[in-house]
């Protein structure tokens, strides 16, 4: 997904992590901007998705910049900054499949749909009438593989990740819904924010840094991430 990935080279303004690998993507670019404005040196630590909250609360990392939304459940365990990206929610499906012309949630009635483990995306599946909710999957590559193999009919994603997937999988497409025809959620639930330890003093510092990065600049950084991911995958 354009939010973050690892690669074996230092191209595209990536940051070295460990074992000769480099982290890249929107999260990394934004982390670099924030660290620069805070006068800090950026260090990126690779942590599995389910290990992010424990890594933060144990002090292994200072902040989670990993495409994470500030859900009410997560807020019970950690604090969040202001958002650093807001996106629409879409469904990725096969371009020539049964649901390729869908335009509203009801059109996915009876479809086998999944989402990423421990995300708002997976919870939103319940809003589709008579849906066949499949087991949550670990990451986007797993969901794409399941979709291509016919194990699922679609998966829920934020738009930038869907754009990146479709650009490298021409047999897939994403369905973007018009107002009142798609998922119901609060902007707070889908806004991507930075997770920090409860009571951490860096919250205000990060928010001050974020306030200086305009919406236009954030969109330019996302465009750069999508473009660079496409270049890596090709």
Question: What is each stretch, according to the model?
Answer:
Residues 4-18, 31-40, 120-140, 144, ...:
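Ligand-binding cleft/hinge of the Venus flytrap
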Residues 51, 67-77, 124-127, 141, ...:
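A ligand-binding cleft/hinge motif common to bilobed small-molecule-binding domains
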Residues 26, 43-54, 100, 135-149, ...:
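Short helix-initiation/N-cap motifs at beta->coil->alpha
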Residues 1-68, 76:
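Extracytoplasmic small-molecule ligand-binding "clamshell" domains
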Residues 39-41, 58-66, 111-112, 148-161, ...:
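Alpha-to-beta junction loops
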Residues 120-137, 174-178, 207-234:
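Ligand-binding clefts/hinges and TM-proximal coupling segments of bilobed small-molecule sensing domains
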Residues 12-13, 94-112:
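Flexible hinge/capping segments at coil-to-helix
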Residues 86-93, 167-210, 230-234:
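Periplasmic-binding protein-like
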């Amino acid at each position: 997904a354009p939010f973050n990935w690892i690669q074996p080279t230092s191209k595209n303004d990536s940051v070295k992590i460990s074992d000769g690998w480099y982290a890249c993507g929107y999260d990394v670019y934004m982390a670099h901007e924030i660290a620069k404005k805070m006068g800090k040196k950026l260090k990126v630590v690779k942590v599995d998705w389910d290990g992010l909250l424990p890594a933060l609360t144990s002090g292994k990392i200072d902040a989670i910049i990993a495409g994470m939304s500030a859900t009410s459940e997560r807020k019970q365990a950690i604090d969040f900054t202001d958002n650093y990206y807001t996106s629409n929610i879409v469904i990725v499906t096969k371009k020539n499949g049964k649901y390729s012309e869908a335009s509203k949630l009801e059109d996915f009635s009876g479809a086998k749909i999944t989402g990423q483990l421990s995300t708002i995306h997976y919870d939103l599946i319940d809003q589709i009438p008579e849906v066949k909710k499949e087991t949550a999957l670990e990451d986007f590559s797993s969901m794409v593989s399941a979709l291509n193999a016919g194990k699922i009919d679609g998966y829920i994603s934020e738009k930038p990740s869907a754009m990146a997937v479709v650009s490298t999988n021409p047999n897939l497409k994403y369905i973007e819904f018009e107002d009142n025809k798609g998922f119901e959620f609060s902007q707070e639930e889908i806004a991507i924010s930075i997770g920090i330890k409860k009571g951490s003093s860096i919250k205000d510092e990060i928010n001050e840094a974020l306030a200086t990065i305009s919406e236009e600049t954030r969109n330019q950084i996302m465009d750069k991430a999508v473009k660079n991911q496409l270049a890596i995958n090709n």
